[in-house]
């Protein structure tokens, strides 16, 4: 698949997450928007809520990870979404513009930023904490950076 610049989770781990949500999640129509879509919800080990939507016509798959949190306004406590990240694969579709060739699949991941009114209307790069939470959900160890170099030689 054609992978967008700056991805942190990666396509392979995304597909592992798709598999886990399909196996352990609950099938539901509450998260779908079109007729030929199938949806699943899954509650992660850390309380994060995952929604998976698969378009049966195109093969596109989208996972939204919401990390619930709390907020206090005056003397009221509110439940809010602390972090919303979306990961998706858009399958390459051949059409008139591709001259019969199927373009590569596209994979992307974004963090959705909420505005002052609570709607998610801006995007940013997925943060490392979110990726770490997903890797822990999948029981996959974090990739350690290579050691060595000058710091190693100086006795670090």
Give residue spans per PLM region:
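Short low-complexity linker/loop segments enriched in small residues
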Residues: 1-156
